[in-house]
Swiss-Prot record:
HAMAP family: Ribosomal_uL1_B (MF_01318_B). One of its GO terms (biological process) is translation. InterPro entries: Ribosom_uL1_bac-type (IPR005878), Ribosomal_uL1 (IPR002143), Ribosomal_uL1-like (IPR023674), Ribosomal_uL1/biogenesis (IPR028364), Ribosomal_uL1_3-a/b-sand (IPR016095), Ribosomal_uL1_CS (IPR023673). PROSITE patterns: RIBOSOMAL_L1. This is Large ribosomal subunit protein uL1. Transmembrane segments: none annotated. Belongs to the universal ribosomal protein uL1 family. Binds directly to 23S rRNA. The L1 stalk is quite mobile in the ribosome, and is involved in E site tRNA release. Protein L1 is also a translational repressor protein, it controls the translation of the L11 operon by binding to its mRNA. The lineage of its organism: Bacteria, Pseudomonadati, Chlorobiota, Chlorobiia, Chlorobiales.
């Protein structure tokens, strides 16, 4: 058995996979069982009682994590020259228009988030098939298609994340690093879950919030009690 497999098995032995823990206890469990030598990302997975095959049950949105993600987020702003300086001053890592569309057509996607102004979306549509599957296509609903590029860049850099339910009814999101103070992790996780609950579709029937699990990179999942998050 590899060392990674052995570590995972040892970590699993410390967690009752059937038990739901209070959030604070679940966070401490994740910290305890994380054995990676790097600062692992903490992820939240939420199981929802929705059928994403129906458009009126698709849950998607954004949330500003109060304590950030702990990750350095690289941002490309696709805009015309009149917005370029504003984007650079706000901290965008890459700024351009047709030159970056050409780079993307040639296979470049080495960026975490793309922000675009509405007047370039027609041209950016040329690379939608490349960006879409990677979750990089700008979207007005997530605030990444806007004339206020400075605000969009600053929010993304500060910890704004985008989420969307998958075909199985699950939502996954990174909410910080294992090195974060436990209270800060709890604040990020609570903000994320509350926003998902707020976005409950009116068409969703039965129990909406069906399960919450937190984990770190390469660690087993730890279940979290749902009662405090159910309206």
């Amino acid at each position: 058995m590899s060392m990674a497999g052995k570590n995972y098995r040892n970590a699993s032995a410390k967690v009752n996979r059937a038990q739901e823990y209070e959030l604070a206890e679940a966070i401490e469990k994740v910290k305890e069982i994380t054995t990676t030598k790097f600062d692992a990302t903490v992820d939240v997975a939420i199981k929802l009682g929705v059928d994403p095959r129906h458009a009126d049950q698709v849950v998607r949105g954004t949330v500003m994590l109060p304590y950030g993600t702990g990750k350095t987020v690289s941002v490309l702003v696709v805009c015309k020259e009149n917005k370029a300086e504003e984007a650079r001053e706000a901290g965008a890592d890459f700024v351009g228009f047709e030159d970056y569309i050409e780079k993307i057509q040639n296979g470049w996607t080495d960026v975490d988030v793309i922000v675009a102004t509405p007047d370039v979306m027609g041209q950016l549509g040329k690379v939608a098939r490349i960006l879409g599957p990677r979750g990089l296509m700008p979207n007005p609903k997530s605030g990444t298609v806007t004339m206020d590029v400075a605000k969009a860049v600053k929010e993304v850099k500060a910890g704004k994340i985008e989420f969307r339910v998958d075909k199985a009814g699950n939502i996954h999101a990174p909410v910080g690093k294992v090195s974060f103070d436990s209270a800060n992790l709890a604040g990020n996780i609570t903000s994320f879950i509350k926003e998902v609950v707020r976005l409950k579709p009116s068409a969703a029937k039965g129990q909406y919030l069906q399960g919450i699990t937190i984990s770190s990179t390469m660690s087993p999942g730890v279940k979290v009690k749902k009662d405090k998050f159910v309206a």
